[in-house]
Amino acid sequence: MEERGFMEVETPVLVSVAAGAMAKPFTTHHNSLDRDLYLRIATELYLKKLIVGGLEKVYEIGRIFRNEGLDFYHNPEFTMLESYEAFADYNDVMEMVEHAVSTLAMEVLGTTTIDLEGEQIDLTPPWPRLSLHEEVKIGSGIDFLECSDLESLRTEMKAAGLDTGEQVSWGGLLDKLISDTVEPKLTQPCFLVDYPVEMSPLAKRNRHDPRL
């Protein structure tokens, strides 16, 4: 990251607002202030404040806490690298990520091909860029851009025989739809792009489609 001009920073772990991801936070209490606080579920907000404050490239490697399920892919406490860069878009970020992952694999393992649960995973860039909208339609037959509210999306999912759980927001329900019908089919490295604004409210809108 330093080679690309990024500055490593540290941001608060105890936060007053648990934001930056769709996840349930761990809650704690600050005795001196007599107020509830949360263990961060992401570093996004503070890193973006630094970008607004004039630091053009920042990143943090830190602990993240999410009070949710525990399985092969999820842990309530984990380490994450998150970065932000001014004057760049998601194309620049994707190039940076695939370069970093493939370079690390080569330096650590001596190869960009790894075995994961018996399947050969090829980390060689470039990775496919997949439209989220198209992948959801392929996986479920649902056009989420035609479902303007929570209940219409819930109705479409039930008609397709899909579990809607107890989601109370349109974005949360779509996230479940993606998890159930798209993610299980993605075995090789790729990028899902063009999420709806409801799922990425702090991201810049797509210049070609303001819904994304």
Regions found by a protein language model. Give the residues of each.
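Class II aminoacyl-tRNA synthetase catalytic cores and aaRS-like
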Residues: E2-L212
